[in-house]
Amino acid sequence: VNDWGMAQLVGRYPEQFELCMGTLLNKRKKDPRLSYLKSRLPDKDTGLLAENSLNADFYQKALEKNLGFVRYEWESCGYPKRFPEEKTSLHLPFYQTNTSQYCTLYAQYREHNRGRQYLQTECPGYCQMQAFLYPEHLHMTGRYNSLFSLDQTILRALETGSVENAAFGEAEQEVQPDRAVLNLL
């Protein structure tokens, strides 16, 4: 489930559904440009990127009790994560960095400046055939109203080991995801 309204609706029928909190609801900082910032931050601050609210037991219990979530989905995003002890899926090698209600392709075509975005009520469908490319070292692309990136650390791990090592060798930790989800955009 990637929508709070849908979670509320299907959470009314716990005997019929086993809910999984999707990657869009599992909020965390995911941006390939963070690696440049990380080199300038003290280690104590970069370690904070490894966790989010799902690492708090009370939050997991509240999600399970109130909405019926029993599994959580994470995205590989180029830096270590600390996974909670609940059932966890890891999506790899692509991840979504952000989504906007505005269309950068529309702004580029109409305004010749992708920064001049505003809400559109009728979509001409530019994104059906076009995408934004970012500098190669970022491994990012802009498609539809979202930015996506490729986790290079996962690809390097695949070259030297198995899919399991790449997916679950995220960090020296006791808890690892129990399922890998391959996404190819």
Where are these regions (language model features)?
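Active-site pocket-lining/capping segments in soluble small-molecule metabolic enzymes
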Residues: 1-185
